[in-house]
Structure formats: structure tokens, C-alpha cells
């Protein structure tokens, strides 16, 4: 049996840290990707208990789920701009706030809302550096057309998303400047941009940019941010499993794929039925980062080739080393000096985001 242990007391502490760091800015809890693997429903409840009443999701169906679970008073912002009729219907059905990132998406949303006699709240997305959803700063006329002609859309906010907050304050500030320039043009035309937001977890904890009216915080809720320094956040999410088999191996016996580890002396080895398929030892692709991060990763990999980095798990309160490469479904550990056997509980650190939803989440205080 495998479970992901989620410590609610750590999440509660993180929520208070986030609120304090946000200052006067509203906190929008980003609960996309099953709340970064921590569990959408449970995280929404913890946020509600912390008086955070604005949620953001990526998938319109998540907005429907939250409403069905009783989150009827909270504002739910769908962060993905869409022109898909089925997804638009889910947004309208749930009373969520839609993201409008193109005039085509705005037209599609307006048309369906108008046909049903509805007015949909929307946030305008401005693309200042991500290159995904959003109006380009040069498309100010299209943004203003949303205000002028699409009367079934009610603009309640405007936002952008930082691409480099985890590594470049300068680039982040340039994005903010570009965003605020668009905001000023909206106001100069006689329209209100509504609630302004730009900062994500990395920006709020790693940069000194303006928090504006609201911050959108996701990964920090689980205590996992790339930004350097001690931010007062507590990491949560531990895989828990049981030892399936214990055996003695003689000296000179290889362990795992590639024979990367060879026993130097008789070794008592335990097998845990947990591997990369369960999210253990899985991290974001290095291609999502810059040259410096990739260079550091390459150096680390080269160093590991000559001097293998050690990883540990917890067995009966003791740190036990992982030996050999982690497999898809199995991990070997050295338990020569640890009293344990089949059925002994083992805890492993894993980013909840990569732990499959099929593995139950167990919430503990």
C-alpha cells in the first residue's frame, strides 16, 4: 500500500506565511494540477479555513468540481483562455471568472453568454514574456474592443504571468513594466482594468517587485519554491510505503540497472515497491530552466558519475541510504544496521506534483 502523507499543519503554516508576505495584496490560491498534487478539495478547504476565498484553476471542469463540493461563495478564476464551447459552458455553469487571452476567445465566450442571457466576469490576460495565452502589449486595440463591444463580458481583473521570476529580477521587472504600460492605456481610454496581479510564488519570495492588488500563489502552499533563501515555508508531501522483501547480498554484488552500485561487503538489502512511476526522484524537466540551471545540472550529473550522490529514506526514524539506480517500480536500500523486515513502513521525500492521483492522499495534523 502506497500513500502520500500531507501534513495539514505545515500547509496551514505556509498559508499564514504567504498571507504575511503578500501584505495588503489579496491572495489567490492556485489549485491547478490537483493543487500541485496535494489534493484539490482538501487544499480548497484549508484555504477557506485560512480566510483565502479566491481560487485559481487551469481546467474549467475543476471549477465545476469545486462548486459541486460546496465552494459556492469563493471566486474561482480559470487561468486558461479558451474558445472551446464545451469548456466555456463549464465556466458559465460554475459561475467562474474566465480568462480572456485573445479576441477570438472573448468573442466565443461573449456569444455563448449572450445566447443564455448571462454576463460573465473575466480577467484580461496580457502576454509580456511567456508567449502562451494573452494579448500582446501591441494588441491594445483588441483589448479595448472587449470593453467597447462585448457587453456580456464584465472585466473584473487584468493580469500577466512571469517567465523568469525564479532566476532574473531584471527580466521580471521588464515584464511588470510592460504590463503596467498596458494597464495605463486601458485607464487612459476610460476603462477600469479591475484587480491587477502578476506575482507568482517565485516572484513573491524571490523578487522585490510590486505585489499589486493580488498575488497568485501555488507551489509555495506546499513549501516548494526554487527561490533561494529561507522563506519560512515548510515542505509537505511524503510518500509512504512498506518494505516488500529483505535479503542478504554478498560483497561484489551489483544492485540495480547499469550496475551503478556494487556492494563492498555483505549487505542486507530491502526492496521498496516505489519508483519513478510513483513520482519518486522525479523533478521538472531541465529544459524548462535556463542555461545556468542546465549547466549546474550537467556538472552535478558528471560529479555523480565519479562520486555518486547519496539519497536517503526514513526507516523506523533512521536515515537509510538508497543504493543503485531507482527503478520504475522499485527502490533498493541498505538496511544492514537497521532492524526491519517485510511490512516495515518507509517514508520517502517526493514532490506531490509528480505523485500520481491513483496514490491515495492521507491528511495528517
Report the location of each language-model feature.
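Active-site-proximal beta-alpha core segment in soluble small-molecule metabolic enzymes
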Residues: 2-6, 10-13, 23-197
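Active-site anion/phosphate-binding pocket segments in diverse small-molecule metabolic enzymes
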Residues: 2-7, 12, 104, 176-365
